[in-house]
C-alpha cells in the first residue's frame, strides 16, 4: 500500500525530526529530506504537502540554504516554520531583517486575519519563538494572519497558492495550539486521509520481510531492550523459525538482566541462543577509556560474536538489528553532524560476514516502536521496559571499564530503579539510570576518611528521545536512593543528580 506522503525539507534546525514525529502522530506518513535533494525527491514522490523547517542560518548569508523556486510552482501546499518562513518571504519579495535582540521563548500570538490554517484556534495563544531574523515586510500576495508584540509578521498565508508560514515553532510542546495548526495544514489544506497507522505498518513490514528473506535464515542481535525485543517479535511473526535470536551476555548488563532476558525469550516460537562472552569483551576493553573507542570496540565484538554463532547455526544470510530513527539521526546520516556513534549504525565494522542487514524499525521513533509492540500483542512489561543502550553499562562507566566498577554500578543502578518504582513514578519518567564517574572524592564514614567514586543519577522525561528534560524527582525519593546506595554499596561516597536537558547534553553520558 502506498501511503500519502508529506516531505519535511531539512534546513538544519534542531527540531527537524520533531516535526516528522508530530506529522506521524497525526496519522500521516512523512520523510525528512535535505534541502539540496528536495526538488528531485518531491518530483519523484509527489507528496500531498511540504514543510520547510527552521535552521540556524540567515537567508541573506553567503552559502545559506536556499530552495529551488520551481517548488513553489508545483501546486503542492507548503508550510514554512521559522527559517522556512523567512525563506518563503524573501523568495516572494518580502523583507527579512536582523532583529536587534534575539527572540527566544514563549510569547503571545494574536490572530489578525482568519485563515484555513488557523481553523479552531484561539484569538490569542502562546507560541514558542527562537529566531534572530524577522520578516519586517510581508511578501506580495500574502496576508498577515498572526502578530506578536515584538514580531508584527508572526504568520502569513497565501490561500490561493496554499502557501503558509509561521515565525514560531508549532512542533514544540511550548506552542500550545501547535498541534492544531499542523493538523489543519495536513487535513484542511493537504486533504490527508490519515492512513499511517501501526496496524498498516505491521502488515506491510511482515510482507516486506517475507519478500526480502524468503526461506533464508536471519540472525538477530537481541539485547532484551525495547527496540530489539519488538524487532524480534516482528521478525518472529514474519518468518518464524527462520529467525535465530542471539543474546550476547557481554558482562555489561544490569543486575539479573541476563537471566530475565532468557526467561522472556527462550520459548518454542524462537530459536534462542545465549552466549556468555563476558571475558571476551572485558579483555578487548582493558585499558580503553575513550567513549567513542569503547563504542566501536563493543560494536565490532558484537559482530564477531554473531559471526561465530552464525557458523554454528549454518547458512545465515541476514543480520537483523533494532535500529530506530533517532539512532540514524544521531549517527550523522545526511547533513546532520555526528553527535556520537550509535552501536547499531556507526559501530559496524567495514567487513560483515552476512549478505545484508535488515533493520525493520529504522524509520520509527521510540514511541512508535512501543505502539508496534502493543500491536504485536507483546506483554506491557517488555514494551515499556527501561531503554538500555547496546553497549550496556560500558557507556555508563566513565573511563576504563573494570569488574569492580561494573559491580558497584549494577548495585547502585538497581537501588535507584527500585526506589523510583516504589515511589510509583516509574511510568512518569522515560529513562532513569546510574553512572559511575571516573572521579574519586574525599568523604567521611564513621571515624574514617574515604576516597571513593562519585556516582551520578540521570533521569529524563521525553516524548521522542530527540529532545529531553531532566526529571523533577521528589527530594525524598532522591534522599532514600542516596542513603541506600551509601549504606549498601561499597566504594561510593558521593552522589550527584544530573539536571541537564537534551540538548545541550545527550541522555547517556558517553
UniProtKB/Swiss-Prot annotation:
The keyword ATP-binding applies. Pfam families: GATase, GMP_synt_C, NAD_synthase. It catalyses: XMP + L-glutamine + ATP + H2O = GMP + L-glutamate + AMP + diphosphate + 2 H(+). Residues 196-385 form the GMPS ATP-PPase domain. The active site is at residues 82, 169, 171. InterPro entries: Class_I_gatase-like, GATASE, GMP_synth_C, GMP_synth_GATase, GMP_synthase, GMPS_ATP_PPase_dom, NAD/GMP_synthase, Rossmann-like_a/b/a_fold. Keywords: ATP-binding, Glutamine amidotransferase, GMP biosynthesis, Ligase, Nucleotide-binding, Purine biosynthesis. One of its GO terms (cellular component) is cytosol. One of its GO terms (molecular function) is GMP synthase activity. This is GMP synthase [glutamine-hydrolyzing]. The gene is guaA.
